[in-house]
Amino acid sequence: SIPGWESLLEHACGECGDGVVLGLGTVLTNEDVSKAIDLGASFIVSPYVSQDVMEAATIEDVAVIPGALTPGEVATAYNMGADMVKIFPASSVGGPKYIKSLLGPVPDWELIPTGGVTPDNAIDFFRAGAAAVGIGTNIAPADKIRSGDWDSVTDAVRDFMDRLNRQLEEGIQ
C-alpha cells in the first residue's frame, strides 16, 4: 500500500542479499503477489484472508500470512493454506491475553500479533504463545521514515532486538 513499493523491495532485496529473509505486506491482489515474488520477496502478508492472494502465494510457493482477528477467521486462514496468521489489531482486543485465549483450544496455531506491539510489551506476547510479533510505528515512526532518518530507525530496531534478545535469554516463562 506504499507508493513505489516495487523499487523499495527491489532495492532492499539487492542490498540485503541471501542472509536476510524479506517479505511484503500489505498485499491486496494476486498481481502484487507475483510482482513481489519476481522482485525477491520470500513471503507475503495481507491484511485479511483473501482467496486470490492465498491462491497466488500457493502457486508461487511462498509463505503467506493473512490477517485475521476472530477464531473463525484464523481457522479459515489455516484451512485456506496460511503458513502463519497475523492478528490485528492485537492490542485493541486484549493484547497478550487475547493471543493466549486464541491458542487455548488450538495451541498449534502460529500467530503474529501486530498493532500496538511495543518494545515494552513484545515479550508478553511471546509469553502468551505468539510465534513472532509485528512492530512498526513504535520503532519506525512515520516522521522518521518520511525524513529518511534511517540512522534513528536502525538504532531503534537494534535497541528493540537487543532488549528482546536479553528478555528471551532470561526465559519466556
Task: Name what the model sees in each region.
Residues S1-C16, N30-S34, I44-N79, P89-P105, ...:
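Active-site-adjacent beta->alpha loops and helix N-cap segments on the catalytic face
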Residues G14-V20, V106-D108, Q167-L168:
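Short helix-capping segments at alpha-helix termini
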Residues V20-G25, I44-S46, V64-G67, V85-I87, ...:
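Hydrophobic faces of well-ordered beta-strands that scaffold small-molecule active sites
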Residues A36, V85, F125, F160:
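Conserved, mostly hydrophobic/aromatic
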Residues N79-M80, R163:
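CE4/NodB-like, metal-dependent polysaccharide N-deacetylase domain
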Residues I123-T137:
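Short glycine/proline-rich, acidic loop/turn segments that cap or connect secondary-structure elements
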Residues R163-Q173:
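Generic C-terminal helix-cap and adjacent flexible tail
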